[in-house]
């Protein structure tokens, strides 16, 4: 089996990376940066997102697993004290995988400009580049739903619903659900302007279009990176046909993670 390790880069993560690379190689596994069957993230959720986007072109062939060297993460099941056990599990046990849905974002430019298709593991956050209010015609399944005015719109996956989406008051969704969630960021509501004011959860066969009603430059944050877009005609969001695969060597129920991160005094 081929493997690759993506490290946060701090001393602790680098030591774990070096140890895992040495021992897994001694067990007969091959360190392969180009075509890994398993990508091991050592760091936090940010490192995991970096690893995902680095190998997003290999989703059908590559599975991911994470070791957290900081605070508990939603994508990093293993701790530094478990590394030796994980090494043995990877070397000796054919791993099982669980698949979770992704968000597909397609940004189309006006007047024959290019089309940019991006996959997100967590979310896409859409704002104007100059900090002014965004004004979108929101379409769902090809029908006008509302005109949104506000600071921005967040579209998240179920596995990303505990991140930016939660901070905006969105619901936490179990990552096995094939859906996306649309959450408002500081919408403008008064006697003249009105939005739904609640998160919307769309199933996989529903598509959302955001069409700018005012010419603006947009900052679109996809997971851990941000891109600037001009002359945007529409932003299309839906559940992607691709899925991310997580390697599983032990059970770590999702609701336990939620409890430990947000509720438990020991989390």
Curated annotation (Swiss-Prot):
Belongs to the NAD kinase family. Its cofactor is a divalent metal cation. PANTHER family: NAD KINASE (PTHR20275:SF0). This is NAD kinase 1. It is found in: Cytoplasm. It catalyses: NAD(+) + ATP = ADP + NADP(+) + H(+). InterPro entries: ATP-NAD_kinase_N, ATP-NAD_kinase_PpnK-typ_C, NAD/diacylglycerol_kinase_sf, NADK. HAMAP family: NAD_kinase (MF_00361). Involved in the regulation of the intracellular balance of NAD and NADP, and is a key enzyme in the biosynthesis of NADP. Catalyzes specifically the phosphorylation on 2'-hydroxyl of the adenosine moiety of NAD to yield NADP.
């Amino acid at each position: 089996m081929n493997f690759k390790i993506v490290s946060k880069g701090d001393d602790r993560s680098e030591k774990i990376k070096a140890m895992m690379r040495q021992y897994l190689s001694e067990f007969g596994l091959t360190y392969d940066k180009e075509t890994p069957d398993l990508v091991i993230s050592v760091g936090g959720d940010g490192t995991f997102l970096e690893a995902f986007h680095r190998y997003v072109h290999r989703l059908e062939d590559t599975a991911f697993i994470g070791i957290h060297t900081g605070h508990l993460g939603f994508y990093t099941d293993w701790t530094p004290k478990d590394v030796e056990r994980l090494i043995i599990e990877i070397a000796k046990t054919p791993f099982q995988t669980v698949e979770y849905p992704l968000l597909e974002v397609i940004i189309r430019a006006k007047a024959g400009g290019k089309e940019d298709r991006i996959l997100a593991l967590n979310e896409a956050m859409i704002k104007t580049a100059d900090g002014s209010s965004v004004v979108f015609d929101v379409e769902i399944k090809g029908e006008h739903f509302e005109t949104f005015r506000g600071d921005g719109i967040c579209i998240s996956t179920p596995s990303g619903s505990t991140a930016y989406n939660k901070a905006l008051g969105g619901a936490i969704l179990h990552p096995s659900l094939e859906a996306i969630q649309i959450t408002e960021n500081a919408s403008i509501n008064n006697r003249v302007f009105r939005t739904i004011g609640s998160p919307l959860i769309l199933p996989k066969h529903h598509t959302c279009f955001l069409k700018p009603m005012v010419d603006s430059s947009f900052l679109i944050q996809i997971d851990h990176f941000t891109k600037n877009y001009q002359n945007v005609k529409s932003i299309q969001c839906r559940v992607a046909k691709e899925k991310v695969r997580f390697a599983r060597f032990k059970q770590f129920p999702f609701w336990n993670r939620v409890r430990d991160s947000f509720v438990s005094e020991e989390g």
